[in-house]
């Protein structure tokens, strides 16, 4: 038994195939999906989705969105996504360091749009780095 998995971003279909297991970064924590899972709709956080297909684990960096599980069909609709194997690890690490420096620089400041954007950029950069591993 397997799952039918589709990961869709506004500009591309990131994954469309079968999987034995999916681990999603929901806003309340990680959710594991196996064949026969109960129906579910959940919000997704910025993070890494893990997919076990053909016995091998693959990572996909997700930039927030929603997931729906119905029977053995899993549909993931996200604001953006990248396959871990297509991310340049060196570039991703450098972007993470820049984002971390920006967040540190804003520490102690009052909440602002700029501070929120800096934190979101940090979360995205961290997800991209984690997806390369």
Swiss-Prot record:
Q: Which superkingdom does the taxonomy of this entry point to?
A: Bacteria
What UniProt keywords apply to this chain's record, in alphabetical order?
ATP synthesis, CF(1), Hydrogen ion transport, Ion transport, Membrane, Thylakoid, Transport
Q: Which InterPro entries match?
A: ATP_synth_F1_dsu/esu (IPR001469), ATP_synth_F1_dsu/esu_N (IPR020546), ATP_synth_F1_esu_C (IPR020547), ATPsynth_dsu/esu_N (IPR036771)
Q: Which GO terms describe its cellular component?
A: plasma membrane-derived thylakoid membrane; proton-transporting ATP synthase complex
Instruction: Please list where the region (Disordered) is annotated.
Output: 103-133
Q: Which molecular-function annotation in GO is an example for this chain?
A: proton-transporting ATP synthase activity, rotational mechanism
**Which SUPFAM superfamilies does UniProt cross-reference here?**
Epsilon subunit of F1F0-ATP synthase N-terminal domain (SSF51344)
Q: Where is the protein localized?
A: Cellular thylakoid membrane
Q: Give the membrane topology.
A: Peripheral membrane protein
Pfam families in the cross-refs: ATP-synt_DE, ATP-synt_DE_N
Report the family membership: Belongs to the ATPase epsilon chain family.
Q: What job does the chain carry out?
A: Produces ATP from ADP in the presence of a proton gradient across the membrane.
Question: Whom does it interact with, and what assembly results?
Answer: F-type ATPases have 2 components, CF(1) - the catalytic core - and CF(0) - the membrane proton channel. CF(1) has five subunits: alpha(3), beta(3), gamma(1), delta(1), epsilon(1). CF(0) has three main subunits: a, b and c.
What is the name attached to this protein's record?
A: ATP synthase epsilon chain
Q: Which organism is it from?
A: Prochlorococcus marinus (strain MIT 9313)
């Amino acid at each position: 038994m397997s799952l039918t998995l589709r990961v869709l971003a506004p500009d591309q279909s990131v994954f469309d195939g079968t999987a034995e297991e999916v681990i999603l970064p929901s806003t309340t924590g990680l959710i594991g999906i196996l064949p026969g899972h109960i129906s579910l709709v959940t919000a997704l956080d910025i993070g890494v989705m893990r997919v076990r297909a053909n016995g091998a684990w693959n990572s996909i960096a997700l930039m927030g969105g929603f997931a729906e599980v119905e029977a053995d069909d899993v549909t993931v609709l996200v604001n953006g996504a990248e396959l871990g194997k297509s991310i340049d690890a060196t570039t991703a690490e450098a972007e993470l360091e820049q984002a971390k420096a920006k967040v540190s620089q804003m520490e102690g400041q009052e909440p602002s749009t700029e501070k929120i954007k800096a934190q979101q950029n940090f979360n995205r950069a961290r997800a991209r780095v984690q997806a390369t591993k």
